[in-house]
Amino acid sequence: MASSSSTSTGDGYNEPWVEKYRPSKVVDIVGNEDAVSRLQVIARDGNMPNLILSGPPGTGKTTSILALAHELLGTNYKEAVLELNASDDRGIDVVRNKIKMFAQKKVTLPPGRHKVVILDEADSMTSGAQQALRRTIEIYSNSTRFALACNTSAKIIEPIQSRCALVRFSRLSDQQILGRLLVVVAAEKVPYVPEGLEAIIFTADGDMRQALNNLQATFSGFSFVNQENVFKVCDQPHPLHVKNIVRNVLESKFDIACDGLKQLYDLGYSPTDIITTLFRIIKNYDMAEYLKLEFMKETGFAHMRICDGVGSYLQLCGLLAKLSIVRETAKAP
């Protein structure tokens, strides 16, 4: 079903809500108050340094730099900004050709303003491309500023890091995501129940982009946002099912817990999906603190083994066995 008449911009085309509701001003960006306040100072003073914006996906890195560039350059944005996704354009030729040619281009800008090169997913650039970029940043420092968005700043070579101001972003809180979702559902007239939005927040895990995409997908597919519809669309292990597994472990019902795990595994969920949901359920489960710490430790070790490639039903059952042993040990006098 079409999302809403307000979303349509052409026949049969629905604009993604993640683009439609992307903030155009730095002050409107949700969460990461410290990072946003630093960018607001840059927007006000107009003296933009080279920047590295580092943090998890969907936390506002690209949106922040786009909004900053719009505020700094105004009507000159189109001719004074070069946007590249470094995961596609990641080789040394891009730096030597596209970026260098843009840096050499003459653009008339107000005093104190510079051209801006935005490199998204810069941590996927090859080492050779980063070395070439370092030299380009140096040579054209009078006319061009560079903004690099990445998930982990450690993958950016030291010479580039030393030439940039580092702005760190963190995952958004549940309340911050909820606030934005309520704005969108009101604007798009989306019928929902509170449990549906809670499910979207759970599946997003601090990622605003994921939250908006899940909201739009659920509304497009079912025209109503409730818990059941959200988990059908997002195709993640249902947290209530996983919660039952944890409860059965705590109640020393190991066989029933294994049966519940087998059901999830047979539905086609990967061990990574199951253990990630399990970890988040344990983290928020009401149990003794020392027990929760031990459960999280064992889950972390199992996750590490699965990430190393040993992803099997046997590993997951082994984890439940260890959690049961931890529980029995805690009960012993």
UniProtKB/Swiss-Prot annotation:
<dbReference type="GO" id="GO:0016887">
    <property type="term" value="F:ATP hydrolysis activity"/>
</dbReference>
<keyword id="KW-0067">ATP-binding</keyword>
<feature type="modified residue" description="N-acetylalanine">
    <location>
        <position position="2"/>
    </location>
</feature>
<keyword id="KW-0235">DNA replication</keyword>
<dbReference type="Pfam" id="PF00004">
    <property type="entry name" value="AAA"/>
</dbReference>
<dbReference type="GO" id="GO:0005634">
    <property type="term" value="C:nucleus"/>
</dbReference>
<dbReference type="InterPro" id="IPR003959">
    <property type="entry name" value="ATPase_AAA_core"/>
</dbReference>
<dbReference type="GO" id="GO:0005524">
    <property type="term" value="F:ATP binding"/>
</dbReference>
<dbReference type="InterPro" id="IPR050238">
    <property type="entry name" value="DNA_Rep/Repair_Clamp_Loader"/>
</dbReference>
<dbReference type="GO" id="GO:0003677">
    <property type="term" value="F:DNA binding"/>
</dbReference>
<dbReference type="InterPro" id="IPR047854">
    <property type="entry name" value="RFC_lid"/>
</dbReference>
<dbReference type="Pfam" id="PF08542">
    <property type="entry name" value="Rep_fac_C"/>
</dbReference>
<feature type="binding site">
    <location>
        <begin position="55"/>
        <end position="62"/>
    </location>
    <ligand>
        <name>ATP</name>
    </ligand>
</feature>
<dbReference type="InterPro" id="IPR003593">
    <property type="entry name" value="AAA+_ATPase"/>
</dbReference>
<dbReference type="InterPro" id="IPR008921">
    <property type="entry name" value="DNA_pol3_clamp-load_cplx_C"/>
</dbReference>
<keyword id="KW-0238">DNA-binding</keyword>
<comment type="function">
    <text>May be involved in DNA replication and thus regulate cell proliferation.</text>
</comment>
<keyword id="KW-0547">Nucleotide-binding</keyword>
<dbReference type="InterPro" id="IPR027417">
    <property type="entry name" value="P-loop_NTPase"/>
</dbReference>
<dbReference type="InterPro" id="IPR013748">
    <property type="entry name" value="Rep_factorC_C"/>
</dbReference>
<comment type="similarity">
    <text>Belongs to the activator 1 small subunits family.</text>
</comment>
<protein>
    <recommendedName>
        <fullName>Replication factor C subunit 2</fullName>
    </recommendedName>
</protein>
<dbReference type="GO" id="GO:0006260">
    <property type="term" value="P:DNA replication"/>
</dbReference>
<keyword id="KW-0539">Nucleus</keyword>
<keyword id="KW-0007">Acetylation</keyword>
<comment type="subunit">
    <text>Heterotetramer of subunits RFC2, RFC3, RFC4 and RFC5 that can form a complex with RFC1.</text>
</comment>
